[in-house]
Structures are given as C-alpha cells and as structure tokens.
C-alpha cells in the first residue's frame, strides 16, 4: 500500500537562501536562531534549556540545517543515529509567501510576480474599497494599512464592535486580510465579505484574502478564533494533488491545505486548530487512509502564533511538542509509505519586523526504500512534488527532480 504523508511545519526555515539579499533577509535562520536562543537560556518561558528535538534529529534535521548554513545549530551534531534522508531546498518562486511555497512543493512554482499593496498607510486603492463596500452594503471600514494581526485588534477592535465597520489590513505578502468580531459582525457575514473581496481583487493579482474572525470584549482579551479561512487563487497548473486525484487516488487536507490550493485536487477536508488537534487529526487520517492516498497537514501555529509574533520560546515549545509526538506517526507507517517533513518559507522569530524570511526549507524524507543520508541542496521545492509523482507512478511534473 503506497501512501504519502506530508507534515508541513509552516515557516520552519533552516537558514537564509542564496537569494535572501533580494528580500532583505541575509542572516535569517529560523531553526538556528531558535536553537541558539534556547542554548543561551533566552527561551525559558514555558519550557527551559537547550532545544530538544531528538526525533527530528534522527530524521536528519540537524544535518540538513548544517548543510544549509555550514555549521550545526547549538545542541545538534554528528552524535545521532540517522534513520531518514535529509536535504534542504531553495525556492524558485518569486515570493516568500504561503501559496508560492505550497504550490511549488506540489510541483508548480510561482514564476510570475504577485500583486502587492506596498503602501504602509492608505494601502488599498479607493476604487477597490468603494466597490467592496457597495457590494457588501457597508458604510465604511477601518485600518487600511500594514499591520500585525494581533496589534490591530488591540487598536481597532472596540471601534469595530461599536461601528460595525470591518478592519481591512495587509502586510508584505500578497494578501488582503479582514478582521471582524464573530458575534457582533457575524462569521457568515465575514465570509461573504471575503468572497466579495476575492472577486473584486481579480485585476490586482493578489494571492489571498484571509478571514480573521476574533472574539472577546475588549483589547485585553480580544483573540483570533479557529475559524480563519483563506480565499486563495487557484494554482496556474495542475499540481501533484490534482494528478493523484485524476488517477483515482485520495488527497486529504488537514488544516488550511485545502484553502491554500483553492480546493484543487482535494478529495477530503478535515478541520483542526492548534498543534495538538492537527497532530491528532493527521494520525487519525493516516490510520484510515487506503492505498494511493496523500495526507497533507499544515501546522500553521509555527507561523501564525510564533513566527509572526516573534515568540522564540513559543516556537521552541511547539517544536518540542511536535517532536515528542513523531514516534506516534512513525509507528503507523508501512513499508511503502513515504513521510515528508518540510516547510513553505521561513519566519525567523528573532528577525526584525513581523514578516516571513527567505530561507532554505528542510526536506526530511522517511520510508519508500529511502536510505538514511544526504539528499543535498535541492534546486526547488518542486523536487518534493516530483518525488511524490514518482512514488505513485504518476505522469512526471514539469518542474523538479525526484529524490526517490
């Protein structure tokens, strides 16, 4: 029975990529800087001591990062019995955003330029917002700027609840984000507003509209809920997910995967929020998955809760939790199963600002006859998609080189 399980640690980069200068990210290193902070006792909130990832280390994480940066991260070295194949991959795509990373690892790199709202204030064209408001029957909106999602709730959440006006904001990514209170504005109303916005953004080539529902009564307890929804453009070509689907296979999305691919190629969507629930759901789907199935999970907390919020200790604690549960996954794998652990970009929690970082991503692969050892530097995330196509004996993808 052949299956592929993709565990995507959102934002878990392993060192600045060769083109990092073009993004202002030279020196960034999500994994390395977390390990360094832990070793120096600077990440002892809710956890303590050096970063402990014994199972990821056995799969080759420390070695993959060493090949990426030229040195082992603090606490990692050669004194580990490797069981997996490891490498690190360069991104071909033009951006360091979520859709680009995901689409490329499924065999479709983004070789065009996304549209962006680059002005930090008055970010959105009036012509665009006028159309959105008219169609939605709204009198106005708040925000209209680049912002951190948590900070903008503290600043504008109460005014939003009083006025009923949605909060529009963006970032360095190709994204239009809308924050609304689940009770006072209504979740269905927020989703409908996002659908309208997605349609009106067509001429602007914006990658995603993101619904950011929140609850609470004031700045001290406003919090995003688990009902986030992404409205992505569809990939410009068929991904390996589409190809497996068309060949009669199954593609199970756990978390926000289905949204990122605009549901293209997805046969089943499983909703889960938080590292524990996402891991539980992944295990449950692997237990029930039949032949010719991909189970694909995005562990978004690493990015949204820890990377963007520059929470080093939280990121470290999350990684250690993930690592401690990996044996549960390994125990479910059959001889012909392929397990891949990777990331879609970096988001170094020690870096300036709150945005993603342009980094190599780890490619850790286990099973399907792979021998433990180095896969080297991969020229594209698309090598993952090509390897999956090879695993299932599908028609080759246009991009990428299989490591199987």
From Swiss-Prot:
Keyword annotations of the record: Cytoplasm, Isomerase, Manganese, Metal-binding
Cofactor note: Binds 2 manganese ions.
Stored SUPFAM superfamilies: Alkaline phosphatase-like, DeoB insert domain-like
Pfam families: Metalloenzyme
Residues annotated for Mn(2+) 1 binding in this entry: 10, 344-345
The organism's place on the tree of life at top rank: Bacteria
NCBIfam families xrefs: deoB (TIGR01696), PRK05362.1 (NF003766)
Listed HAMAP family: Phosphopentomut
Protein name per the record: Phosphopentomutase
Organism (species): Shewanella baltica (strain OS155 / ATCC BAA-1091)
High-level lineage: Bacteria, Pseudomonadati, Pseudomonadota, Gammaproteobacteria, Alteromonadales
């Amino acid at each position: 029975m052949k299956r592929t399980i993709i565990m995507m640690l959102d934002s878990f980069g392993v060192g600045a990529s060769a083109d990092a200068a073009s993004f202002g990210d030279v020196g960034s290193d999500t994994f390395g800087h977390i390990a360094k902070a832990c070793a120096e006792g600077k990440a002892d909130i809710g956890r303590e001591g050096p970063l402990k990832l014994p199972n990821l280390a056995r799969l080759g994480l420390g070695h993959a990062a060493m090949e990426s940066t030229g040195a082992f991260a603090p606490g990692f070295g050669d004194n580990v019995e490797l069981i997996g194949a490891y490498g690190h991959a360069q991104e071909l795509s033009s951006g360091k955003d979520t859709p680009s990373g995901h689409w490329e690892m499924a065999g479709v790199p983004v070789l065009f330029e996304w549209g962006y709202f680059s002005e930090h204030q008055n970010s959105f064209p009036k012509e665009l917002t006028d159309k959105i408001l008219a169609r939605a029957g709204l009198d106005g909106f708040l925000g209209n700027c680049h912002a951190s999602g948590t900070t903008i709730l503290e600043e504008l959440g109460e005014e939003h609840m009083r006025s009923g006006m949605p909060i529009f904001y963006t970032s360095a990514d190709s994204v239009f984000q809308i924050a609304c209170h689940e009770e006072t504005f209504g979740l269905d109303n927020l989703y409908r507003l996002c659908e309208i916005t997605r349609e009106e953004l067509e001429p602007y080539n914006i990658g995603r509209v993101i619904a950011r529902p929140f609850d609470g009564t004031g700045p001290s307890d406003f919090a995003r809920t688990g009902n986030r929804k992404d409205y992505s453009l569809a990939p410009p070509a068929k991904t390996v997910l589409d190809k497996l689907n068309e060949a009669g296979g199954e593609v199970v999305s756990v978390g926000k995967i289905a949204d990122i691919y605009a549901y293209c190629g997805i046969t089943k969507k499983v909703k889960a929020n938080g590292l524990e629930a996402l891991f539980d759901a992944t295990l449950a789907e692997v237990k029930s998955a039949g032949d010719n199935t991909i189970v694909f999970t995005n562990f978004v907390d690493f990015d949204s809760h820890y990377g963007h919020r520059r929470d080093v200790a939280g990121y470290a604690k999350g990684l250690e939790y993930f690592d401690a549960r990996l044996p549960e996954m390994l125990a479910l794998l059959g001889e012909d199963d392929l397990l891949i652990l990777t990331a879609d970009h970096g988001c170094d929690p020690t870096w300036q600002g709150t945005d993603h970082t342009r980094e190599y991503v780890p490619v850790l692969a286990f099973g399907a006859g792979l021998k433990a050892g180095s896969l080297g530097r991969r020229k594209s995330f698309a090598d993952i998609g090509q390897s999956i196509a090879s695993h299932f004996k599908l028609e080759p993808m246009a991009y990428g080189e299989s490591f199987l």
